[in-house]
């Protein structure tokens, strides 16, 4: 059930961003296979292009230099250090990396997104049918007063 809610929330955030009304991406657990991601790479494997954009709430503006740490299980259904890396968004808040299809049920990729002035986002992309390319938007919340 929680996976269905996340997919629906990501779709809502994606559609809302084009309506100039950003909804923050929901937070999801880092899972049991989290380990600190220490390698910066644009490509960790081949077969799946992952691209998207990081925007700010509530104005839907691109967030440049956001750090996206990602990890996932591979085609064999196992988590591996080779599929853990981080990268940064460009000046337009966009990111792109290549990986392999996450062969778990449901297929998913974990993300931790950090950017100066924004709350840290821990979330997951969830898929259904095998694809060669996926694209989505993540919306960050501005940090409140501490």
Regions found by a protein language model. Name each.
Residues 14-19:
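Sec/Tat signal peptide C-region and signal peptidase I cleavage site
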Residues 20-146:
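Beta-strand-dominated extracellular/periplasmic modules and repeats
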Residues 4-13:
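Sec-dependent N-terminal signal peptides
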């Amino acid at each position: 059930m929680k996976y269905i809610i996340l997919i629906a929330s990501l779709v809502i955030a994606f559609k809302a961003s084009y309506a100039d009304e950003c909804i923050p991406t929901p937070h999801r657990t880092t899972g049991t296979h989290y380990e600190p991601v220490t390698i910066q790479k644009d490509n960790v494997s081949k077969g799946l292009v992952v691209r998207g954009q990081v925007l700010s709430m509530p104005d839907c503006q691109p967030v440049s230099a956001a750090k996206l740490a990602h990890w996932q299980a591979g085609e064999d259904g196992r988590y591996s250090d080779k599929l853990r890396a981080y990268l940064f968004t460009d000046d337009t808040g966009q990111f792109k990396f290549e990986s392999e299809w996450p062969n778990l049920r449901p297929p998913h990729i974990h993300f931790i997104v950090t950017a100066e002035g924004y709350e840290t986002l821990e979330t997951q992309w969830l898929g259904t049918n095998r694809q060669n390319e996926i694209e989505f938007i993540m919306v960050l919340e501005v940090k409140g007063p501490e």
